Amino acid sequence: KDVVLNYTHTPIYDGFQGISCYNRETTWITNNKTYEDITTVVPLKNSEDDEDVQSVVTVSMPIEDLRTLVAHASGYTAKYSLSSMVGESKAFVQMKERAYRLARNKNHILLQGEAGIGKQRLAHGIHMASMRMAGPLISINCADSTPELLEQDIFGAATDSDVSHPGKLELASKGTLFIDEIEKLPSSIAKMLAKALSEKKTHRIGESLERSIDVRIIAASDANLRRLTEKGQFDEKLSNIITRSIIRVPSLRSRKDDIPMKAVNII
């Protein structure tokens, strides 16, 4: 196997005096690694009316670099820092200190606590304090769609023989994927996700081509994930991957002294 082309040739823009440019995803498969490039092809003519292409200009860049640029342009970046989270109660300070420590290691992280206590904001802060802060932060909620759509959203899909779309697992490569309400992730998808994270490879639904990924998961759960796993209600392999580092987010009622400060911060 030398080169595999994903047959994508959609016009990107009319540039260079109205000449259409075309985009191709190119996958180079070697014995050691799979490389993915995005190649832009610009056909050059003597004039706009000339039908004959005299030459072409091609520009290639690693597809992960392009996805990072697109992610930032699309707003897939952290909006909150850990320092923006206010509170002086002992439970809050300890949680924040642990978040700073865990942000700097390479483990996946589970945020555990009641709904509405700021787990998503905490995920933003951890990403911003991590070594992946220059990469994208992409979010997904397991309760927001059907299992079929959720599967495609995470892994991507080939919609027909010519068109293939990346999933958020790919788009978050070199960055962080925040998975909210992960306890509601269907078992079949949980098994696929555990396999992808273990092997650091994924494939889009409807395709067999494997793509390398480098992504950190920050998951959030309202429930005790380890307890659900013990009861057989959550995939054990995925649980083992994401529960190595747990941050328990204290409820607001357990830190009533922080309420006035939070109110001022909101105002």
Feature names for model-found ranges:
Residues 161-164, 190-211, 220:
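Substrate-gripping "pore-loop 1 plus following alpha2 helix"
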Residues 1-80:
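N-terminal accessory segments that target, anchor, or regulate ATP-driven/P-loop NTPase machines
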Residues 8, 81, 88-92, 186-190, ...:
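The cytosolic transmitter module of two-component sensor histidine kinases
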Residues 71-96, 148:
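Dynamic helix-loop-helix/coil hinge segments at AAA+ ATPase domain boundaries and subdomain interfaces
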Residues 84, 98-162, 170-186, 251-256:
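Conserved post-Walker A coupling segment in P-loop NTPases
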Residues 109, 145-152, 169-199, 215-219, ...:
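Conserved AAA+/SF3 P-loop NTPase catalytic/coupling segment centered on the Walker-B
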Residues 130-135, 206-216, 223-267:
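Nucleotide-binding/hydrolysis machinery
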